[in-house]
């Protein structure tokens, strides 16, 4: 019988789920270097997939404990944009179904833009409910960034299509009667908070890219409003915009000059 090509072996390995598969045993006996490399790669991919499953299970601990108590609508809440000099603070509340699984889900800041966009679409497709809260720079200046973040989180909860039975919040406590747990670095410890961080990050990044189109001299689509050298130089040359947070240094100092 004619041996399969290396490409055919690669395609076959993509179909094989475990070592007991007769086709896998056949490939293991193939002594060609190209096939043996593919088998090594297959093992590495399986190992990575197992680690991702274990990490996801670990990040589902809070949700699973609450589900064991009979709760269904558990909302993870996170914010993006507390530190920038321009643009809104954006929060998201996400309620995920029990069978939800995305390998590699993590804090949005640790993901590439391409992965965030892909995960954003998957979360949108599978979440039970998603709520977003957006607070403008003007309101941030009026009530301060901490209060604005809290308000944005409350707005995100109010914008959910279901009433959550429990809130898992990244490092904040909210003035609400809904039971809640505040989790430090929650976006790396809870799948719901992680999903919320991705929704909030992609939502805000898209808004800042639009702002970049409106004000091309400022480069908002690159720094997302953070105080980079490029951003500060643009403010010095072109001035402060209505989208800037005038209560934040160094914008505040520039206005007072």
Swiss-Prot record:
Manganese or magnesium. Binds 1 divalent metal ion per monomer in the absence of substrate. May bind a second metal ion after substrate binding. The keyword Nucleus does not apply. GO terms for molecular function: manganese ion binding; RNA binding; RNA-DNA hybrid ribonuclease activity. Its cofactor is Mn(2+); Mg(2+). Endonuclease that specifically degrades the RNA of RNA-DNA hybrids. PANTHER family: RIBONUCLEASE H2 SUBUNIT A, RIBONUCLEASE HII. Belongs to the RNase HII family. This is Ribonuclease HII. It comes from Bacillus mycoides (strain KBAB4). The gene is rnhB.
């Amino acid at each position: 019988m004619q041996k399969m090509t290396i490409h055919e072996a690669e395609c076959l390995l993509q179909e094989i789920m475990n070592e007991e598969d007769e086709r896998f045993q056949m490939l293991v006996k193939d002594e060609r270097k190209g096939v043996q490399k593919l088998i090594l790669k297959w093992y590495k991919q399986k190992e990575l997939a197992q680690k991702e499953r274990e990490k996801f299970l670990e990040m589902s601990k809070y949700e699973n404990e609450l589900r064991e108590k009979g709760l269904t609508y558990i909302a993870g809440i996170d914010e993006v944009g507390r530190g920038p000099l321009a643009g809104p603070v954006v929060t998201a509340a996400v309620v995920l179904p029990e069978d939800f699984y995305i390998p590699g889900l993590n804090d949005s800041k640790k993901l590439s833009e391409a992965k965030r966009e892909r995960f954003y679409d998957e979360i949108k497709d599978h979440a039970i409910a998603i709520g977003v809260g957006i607070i403008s720079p003007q309101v941030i200046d009026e009530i301060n960034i901490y209060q604005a973040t809290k308000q944005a989180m409350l707005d995100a909860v109010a914008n959910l299509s279901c009433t959550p039975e429990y809130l898992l919040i990244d490092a904040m406590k909210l003035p609400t009667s809904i039971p809640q747990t505040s989790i430090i670095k929650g976006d790396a410890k809870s799948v719901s908070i992680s999903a919320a961080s991705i929704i909030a990050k992609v939502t805000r990044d898209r808004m800042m890219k639009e702002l970049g189109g409106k004000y091309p001299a400022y480069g908002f689509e690159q720094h997302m409003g953070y105080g980079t050298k490029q951003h500060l130089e643009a403010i010095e040359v072109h001035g402060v915009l209505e989208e800037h947070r005038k209560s934040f240094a160094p914008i505040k100092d520039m206005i007072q000059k």
